[in-house]
């Protein structure tokens, strides 16, 4: 169940990232069209690349958060706890045997 939730969250993050990249490309294209000099066009292209890289970094960050959530909320089988449920050694006082 948790892995399915993680996959769905990852798919949502991927869709959001693609929208952000598409928006950055459209905005960059508009800026390049409005630019008059080669220098302005180059600056617009650099801003477009920067926004795309930021969107990809956000995707990786959200995927890491989803993976961390999956580890925190991991399912334990009954009787298989992560801590000892009883004493593991002999319960006799030293020197009594």
Swiss-Prot record:
List, alphabetically, the InterPro entries matched: LEA_1 (IPR005513)
Keyword annotations: Coiled coil, Stress response
Q: Which is a Pfam family this sequence falls into?
A: LEA_1
Query: Where do the segments described as Disordered lie?
Result: 1-97
A single Gene Ontology CC term? cytosol
Q: Which parts of the chain are coiled coil?
A: 34-63
Residue ranges with Basic and acidic residues bias: 1-19, 42-68
Query: What is this protein's expression induced by?
Result: By dehydration stress.
Biological function: Involved dehydration tolerance. Involved in the adaptive response of vascular plants to withstand water deficit. May possess chaperone-like activity under water deficit. Binds to negatively charged membranes of liposomes. This binding induces partial folding of the largely unstructured LEA18 protein, vesicle aggregation, and leakage of soluble content from liposomes.
Family indicated by similarity: Belongs to the LEA type 1 family.
Additional information = Under water deficit, the N-terminal region is necessary and sufficient for conformational transition from disordered to alpha-helix folding. This conformational transition is required for chaperone-like activity under water limitation.
What is this protein's name? Late embryogenesis abundant protein 18
